[in-house]
From Swiss-Prot:
Record PTM Phosphothreonine, positions in chain: 358, 482, 517, 598, 723, 732, 763
Record CDD domains: CID_RPRD2 (cd17001)
Ranges of residues in domain CID: 19-149
Residues modified as Phosphoserine: 16, 356, 374, 473, 476, 479, 485, 564, 593, 614, 663, 665, 716, 730, 758, 762, 769, 817, 826, 900, 909, 928, 965, 976, 1068, 1099
Biased composition (Gly residues): 1151-1160, 1382-1391
Gene from which this protein is expressed: RPRD2
Bias type Pro residues, positions: 1267-1277, 1290-1299
Record protein name field: Regulation of nuclear pre-mRNA domain-containing protein 2
One GO MF term attached to the UniProt entry: RNA polymerase II C-terminal domain binding
């Protein structure tokens, strides 16, 4: 690779050299900035493939950046490589596979981190499944992924020696497997197999015969004993003769066996091929069979519904529409022509006779030909279509006399449903017309021959009169179809010829449907017209005008082609004529307006459905497919059956359409007919059944196309066959149900679509993405539903937001990530998405969500459904982004956030916030530059793991450090668990999102928080679901997460929860207390060099009072804990607190403890302030730890605010899992109690706990004592490990806030891990004493579960989180114990240990400290920057990274405590 890279740049000419240099710099830039978004990866992948001549340079630089990058970014680079490797062959750049094969073993060794290894393993599995690389290569890569570095190097050497060559050789042998299979399936001929088997059978018989002959031989050729018995010459000669005979027979036998042995392999090969072929066939057949089953179910359901509706339908003559009564005569007139056409007997006989009389096969063939656009008919139909487009009236011009008559007939039929016979007659008329229209003149001729033109003319005239009576003008005809089948229109236009083929059927369908309502009849007519000859067109125009459905002439055509349109929508529909017929049902379920989903059927069906005639609708629906697919008869039959009244009309009418329909798809038709037959209401169907049989011959011709399309369709299950299945599964209303719903003609495709989409029904999505297949449609559905969801969960960007809006947040998460991966999860309960969100994404879902993004990215290019839903996801994510450009929040929240603090925040620390914000939006990491993508891909990867990384790696630098640093792995590990728990618990942890939040929390969180605020106010019930509605209401969004878990401990719990994110809850109230000036930057407390600085920072930081909060960013810091949390965890915690920020300014006050309200306010307003602060010192760090440090005096205010108290109460509530007091308060007790637990459970937790514990000294500050004796500053090196957010700025422990509440604790821990897990823990005790043990502990406690899980899920998260937190706390407890004083303060005391006051204030301070510590962890992420930042805080006992920079923000890794459920 290196050589290749060198070669690429070392060109002879200077120009080439300069170009190579430009290429390399461009490569560096591109590889450095690639994110985990599909757009970024696919765009860079395409660029690489286009520059394939520089493949060696590209791969070399890819490897270079893989080595340099943090784990999340490494995963992004792996996604990029995957995209290139999988697409290079298709794009004629296969060289990339070999180039990457050289470096992949080493690359695999660089992505062993648990946060990304799962995603990479998934990539390898895809390569294996798709034979991208040989199995040996994949095995080697997997080994590299799981081995140590030394063995990796050996592996790489071995692999470079052997596998690459082997791979190049075996590429032809392995890859061919799939190609061979497809070749076998394509070339398999059953006749050859039969011949081989017969040959074998013959040879077997021959051998058997020879065997028998040998057994009857008198001489035992093989025995020498007989020779001894020879005595005389005669006997010897006799024996010799017999022996020779026997030996010749034996020779023949042996030769026969040899022959069989030689022929055996070919036979076995043939049998193997047959096995492969028939297996493939079986799979396809199973899909079709299942589709038919679902279709049958749909038909049965529809029959039931139709039966119910039939009882409610008025008599045709009593139909509300006047047209029906007028139609009565028309049908009679129609009857004559129908009989003339060859259906003189009863309707069903007529149909049959018509089938026979009219060139049925021809008609069917013509239908097929129509699809192929025969010359003669093609011109006619094209003209007709154009005419229709231009003028409905002109259509009649095509066949002037006929069209007029049919139109009239149709009008009459539609106006008078009870005139089924007449109607039937009319359809035949249109049928001939259609035939003429159709490419097959033969059909037209026979039809015309059978039809009495005079009768047709009279019928048409009567129809026209009826139309006039109806008050519909032919001109308006085009409109009717439009609403009903907008989708079909396009398609329809495409396939006018087929439509023409089915024109007579459509007429019959129309007639049969007429009985339902004039509108439905009109709709049917318009369809028929489209398909029928000009006469039919005229009818359709008249009908359409009558219907009032705005269907342009082109629409009529489109309807006739609707099969095609439907097919376009349901591209497979057309192919599956049967399904097409089924589709009417499906489309209803899908599109709700069959016209769109189905082809023509769709259009008519839509009209009918809109009319609200259940029977008519089905009839129309069937008819449409029939028309489009040549199913008219079938559809008609089916429709006829549904409407009892219609059946009479339909019977004759259907019989005729069935002729065509028959040709379309006999089996489906038969099935439909059977279903209809089964239903007493479908008496007309029985008549149609004969047609079905007739259609059988005709149907096959269309059947093939239908099969052709059906295959994909069934596969997708999106349309027709597939759709029913998907719809049922998704709980989407069945077509029948859909039909029932849109009973009025008002139902149009658009409205139906919107309606469907809104509810998250699968119908629209499936309609939208029929090609991808059921999966796609499903995900799409999900997307749609999620999108509905999303407004609430726009905060997907920040898992923490979930804490604030536990439910909503997950929704957004789901929307962006989970939706992709867990469409059903997110989608399932669209309507209840908010409540459901939390529970909706089960832990696994969350995890999947986290993982899936990677998958989606991996798959986006390979899976249509993935791709389809991914775009949707991306669109949703985009939407989320739109909502929260800064973070994924609803626009309003976003606006709040943006206006108040988000802008500042983002502007002030674009690096931190921008990335985070971006990140938060999509999976939360897409937006972020590199960290964002890393995080995002953390999400896709082992999302849980990646969370921690995301959190830590969220910051670009930290991310890098992350992979390299000792704790990155452990951190990740911790994070992984945490994320796992958190993710499962709720979206908040969705590892990717959560990570994103870790960094993005500030922006994301803020926006999310705002979202939450909005949501909190608007969906308290959801919160209540989790028993946190009240809290949520108060804290608004900031507490949303915590609220979910802390109804009673709003302040404390929130802080705990938020602490996890931001530990700003307490700060909120403190913020309120503190004057704005303090809050502004708060007097930077001198103290702070240690965790106490963290505390201080909470208090000392510019504490944001309510007002401050209102002012984005200014006093955020000040909010006791919240301020602190915001300070360093602005992004992470902002989700809860920040979102609330603006709206929560007052809420903050209300929270008193700075609960979520304060948090929110703090986050929102402080966000700006804090962002700058962070930038000044360490970005987020600065807010928590620095502010604490600088604003020691501030802490008291926050404490005073009462946040401490609130916090305490909240803490206890939250703490139930843990000691409530400590939890609520500082977790000092909790911490002690749980510290060991944390230690044991999660080293990082420990660290986090320790880090949290470290903050206790600041608690003193936080509590009443602004400058409580600051505990000795934690060792500068250890501040990170110690986790004193404020103090450990130099190497602040990763902020736990990004993590779930429980994660919060872990977060600080990872930084410790960075410093050394053991050391961190140990240090923490030291630091703890100097830092705020209580704070850390409390932070952990606070953040642990409650915050994590807003709501049951949140609670779960909290519970687990708390458990984790407890563990964390336990560690901190230890630390606190080490610190003694901080923890000594009891719940509050823990926080204030150092200070001494352990009460509420202490609690608050603790939270603040925790926040600080959290910040600390972040700085750990980018310790160096923090060190720079520290300079400003050199006064701190322990230099802390100044908040100036985002590094602390970025640097702190949030412990990945998997939330405990």
């Amino acid at each position: 690779m290196a050589a290749g890279g060198g070669g690429g740049s070392s060109k002879a000419s200077s120009s080439s050299a300069s170009s190579a240099g430009a290429l390399e710099s461009s490569l560096d830039r591109k590889f450095q900035s690639v994110t985990n978004t599909m757009e970024s990866i696919q765009g860079l992948s395409s660029w690489c493939i286009e520059n394939k001549k520089h493949h060696s340079t590209i791969v070399y630089h890819w490897m270079k950046w893989l080595r340099r990058s943090a784990y999340p970014h490494r995963l992004n680079l792996f996604y990029l490589a995957n995209d290139v490797i999988q697409n290079c062959k298709r794009k004629n750049a296969i060289i990339f596979r070999e180039s990457f094969a050289d470096v992949l073993p080493e690359a695999a060794a660089l992505v062993k981190d648990p946060s990304v290894s799962k995603s990479v393993e998934r990539i390898f599995k895809i390569w294996e499944d798709r034979n991208v690389y040989p199995e040996e290569m994949i095995v080697a890569l997997r080994e590299a992924l799981s081995t140590t570095f030394k063995t990796q190097k050996q592996l790489k050497e071995n692999l470079n020696k052997q596998p690459n060559k082997q791979w190049k050789k075996s590429q032809t042998s392995t890859n061919p497997k799939a190609a061979l299979k497809s070749k076998i399936v394509a070339e398999f001929r059953s006749q050859a197999l039969i011949e081989e088997l017969l040959l074998y059978k013959r040879s077997e018989d021959q051998i058997e015969l020879k065997e028998k002959q040998l057994s009857t031989m008198r001489v035992d050729v093989c025995s020498t004993e007989t020779l001894k018995c020879l005595k005389d010459k005669t006997g010897g000669k006799k024996f010799s003769k017999e022996f020779e005979e026997a030996s010749s027979k034996l020779e023949e036998f042996v030769n026969g066996l040899d022959k069989q042995v030689k022929n055996g392999p070919s036979l076995t090969e043939a049998l193997e091929n047959a096995g492969i072929f028939y297996e493939a066939q079986y799979k396809e057949v199973k899909v079709v069979a299942n589709a038919y089953k679902t279709f049958a179910n749909r038909v049965n359901n529809l029959k039931k519904k139709l039966d119910q509706l039939k009882s409610t339908l008025p008599d045709p003559e009593e139909s509300p529409v006047p047209s029906p009564s007028m139609d009565a005569p028309s049908p009679t007139g129609s009857e004559s022509p129908f009989q003339g056409m060859g259906g003189e007997e009863s309707q069903s006989p007529t149909m049959e006779s018509e089938k026979s009389a009219t060139p049925e096969p021809v008609t069917d063939n013509r239908d097929v030909e129509d699809m192929e656009l025969s010359d003669v008919e093609d011109d006619g139909s094209k003209i007709i279509v154009e005419d229709r487009k231009e003028k409905p009236a002109e259509k009649s011009a095509v066949s002037t006399s006929v069209p007029t008559k049919p139109t009239e007939n149709i009008s009459k039929a539609s106006s008078c449903t009870p005139v089924p016979v007449t109607m039937t007659a009319t359809p035949p008329l249109p049928k001939p017309v259609n035939t003429s229209l159709s490419p097959s003149p033969a059909l037209a001729l026979p039809n015309l021959a059978n039809v009495d033109l005079a009768k047709i003319s009279s019928i048409l005239s009567s129809l026209t009169s009826v139309m006039k009576n109806t008050g519909v003008s032919p001109a308006s005809r085009p409109s009717p179809g439009t609403p009903t089948s907008p989708s079909n229109l396009t398609s329809g236009l495409k396939t006018p010829a087929p439509a023409t083929t089915t024109s007579h059927n459509p007429l019959a369908n129309i007639l049969s449907k007429v009985e339902i309502t004039p509108e439905s009849i009109l709709s049917a007519l318009s369809k028929t017209q489209t398909q029928s000859a000009p006469a039919l067109q005229g009818l359709s125009s008249l009908l359409q005008s009558v219907t009032g459905n705005p269907v342009p002439a082109s629409e009529a055509a489109s309807q006739s082609t609707s099969a095609s349109p439907a097919n376009t929508t349901v591209s497979t529909i057309k192919g599956r004529n049967l399904p097409s017929s089924a589709q009417p049902f499906i489309p209803k379920s899908f599109n709700y307006s069959p016209n769109s989903s189905t082809s023509e059927v769709s259009s008519t069906s839509a009209s009918k459905a809109s009319i609200g005639q259940s029977p008519g609708l089905p009839s129309t629906t069937f008819k449409l497919p029939s028309n489009s697919l040549g199913f008219t008869a079938t559809h008609n039959t089916s429709p006829a059956a549904p409407p009892t009244e219609v059946t009479i009309c339909q019977s004759s009418e259907v019989s005729k359409p069935k002729l065509e329909s028959e040709s379309t798809s006999p089996s489906l038709e038969m099935k439909i007919h059977n279903f209809l037959k089964g239903n007493p209401g479908f008496s007309g169907l029985n008549l149609n059944i004969p047609i079905l049989s007739s259609l059988g011959s005709s149907a096959p011709s269309e059947s093939h196309p239908s099969d052709f399309q059906r295959g994909p369709t069934s596969t997708s299950i999106d349309n027709i066959d597939g759709t029913p299945v998907r719809d049922e599964r998704s709980g989407t209303p069945t077509q029948d149900e859909m039909m029932d719903k849109p009973t009025s003609s008002s139902v149009d495709t658009m409205s139906l679509l919107s309606k469907i989409i809104s509810p998250g029904s699968s119908t629209p999505s499936s309609t939208r993405s029929p090609p991808p297949g059921r999966d796609e449609s499903y995900p799409r559905e999900l997307s749609n539903s999620v999108s509905t969801y999303r407004p609430f969960g726009l905060g997907s960007e920040s898992p923490y937001k979930q804490p604030s809006d536990g439910m909503e947040r997950p929704s957004s998460l789901m929307d962006s990530s989970q939706e992709k991966f867990y469409p059903d999860t997110s989608f399932q309960e669209d309507e209840d998405y908010r409540d459901f969100e939390y529970s909706g994404p089960p832990p696994s879902a969350m995890m999947n969500l986290e993982k899936k993004p990677a998958k989606s990215i991996l798959k986006s290019s390979k899976l249509s459904d993935t791709t389809e839903y991914q775009p949707i996801l991306s669109s949703y994510s985009h939407r989320a982004q739109e909502f929260g450009v800064k973070s994924a929040f609803p626009p309003s929240v976003r606006a709040l956030l943006d206006s108040s603090e988000n802008c500042d925040r983002l502007s002030s620390s674009p690096g931190l916030f921008g990335a985070f914000s971006v990140r938060g939006n999509e999976p939360g990491s897409d937006r972020s530059p590199s960290p964002s993508k890393n995080d995002s891909f953390f999400t896709p990867d082992s999302n849980h793991n990646s969370l921690s990384q995301s959190t830590t790696g969220h910051l670009s630098l930290p991310q890098k450090q992350y992979p390299d640093s000792p704790h990155p792995v452990p951190h990740r590990s911790l994070f992984s668990p945490q994320n796992t728990l958190a993710a499962p618990t709720g979206h908040p942890p969705t590892s990717g999102v959560e990570k994103v939040l870790a960094s993005t929390i500030s922006t994301t969180s803020t926006i999310e928080f705002k979202n939450m605020l909005k949501n909190a106010s608007r969906k308290p019930s959801d919160d209540k679901h989790f028993g946190q509605a009240p809290s949520k209401g108060t804290p608004s969004d900031g507490v949303s997460l915590s609220n979910l878990t802390q109804p009673s401990l709003t302040a404390t719990d929130q802080q705990q929860q938020e602490e996890h994110y931001r530990i700003e809850t307490r700060v909120s109230s403190s913020c309120l207390d503190l004057p704005d000036s303090t809050e502004e930057k708060g007097a930077p407390i001198e103290t702070l060099g240690y965790h106490s600085a963290s505390n201080r920072r909470m208090s000392g930081e510019p504490i944001q009072t309510v007002e401050s909060i209102r002012v984005p960013g200014k006093g955020n810091r000040g909010h006791g804990r919240e301020a602190s949390r915001v300070g360093w965890f602005d992004l992470s915690t902002s989700g809860s607190s920040f979102d609330n920020g603006p709206s929560s300014a007052s809420e903050l006050a209300s929270l008193g403890g700075g609960g979520s309200g304060g948090l929110t306010g703090f986050k929102t307003a402080p966000y700006k302030e804090r962002a700058p602060q962070f930038q000044e010192s360490v970005g987020s760090f600065r807010s928590n730890s620095f502010n604490s440090t600088f604003e020691h005096h501030l802490p008291p205010s926050p404490l005073e605010h009462g946040t401490p108290f609130q916090r305490e109460p909240v803490g206890p509530s939250s703490a139930p899992p843990v000691p409530p007091k400590d939890h609520g308060g500082i977790f000092s007790r909790d911490a002690p109690t749980h510290l060991p637990s944390v230690d044991l459970s999660n080293p990082f937790t420990k660290e986090a706990a320790l880090a949290h514990a470290a903050p206790p000294p600041p608690p003193g500050e936080h509590s009443g004592i602004p400058f409580p004796t600051p505990p000795p500053p934690p060792p500068p090196g250890e501040h990170s490990s110690s986790g004193g957010s404020g103090v450990p700025f130099s190497t602040p422990p990763p902020p736990p806030p990004p993590v779930d509440h429980s994660g919060v604790v872990p977060f600080p821990a990872p930084p410790l891990a960075e410093h050394g897990v053991a050391g961190a823990v140990a240090v923490f005790p030291k630091d703890h004493s100097s830092l705020l043990q209580g704070t850390l502990a409390e932070h952990f406690g606070v953040l642990p579960g409650p915050r994590d899980h807003g709501g049951p899920t949140q609670r779960d998260l909290n519970g687990p989180g708390l458990s984790r937190v407890r563990e964390s706390l336990t560690l901190p407890s230890h630390s606190l114990e080490h610190l003694g004083p901080p923890h000594g303060g009891g719940g509050g005391g823990g926080s204030n240990s150092s200070s001494g006051p352990p009460l509420g204030p202490s609690h608050r301070d603790t939270i603040s400290r925790s926040g600080i510590i959290l910040r600390s962890p972040r700085p750990d992420f980018r310790p160096r920057e923090p060190f720079l930042s520290r300079d400003p805080f050199h006064s701190l006992k322990r230099p802390r990274p100044p908040f100036a920079r985002g590094p602390p923000f970025f640097a702190p890794k949030r412990p990945f405590f998997p939330p405990r459920y």
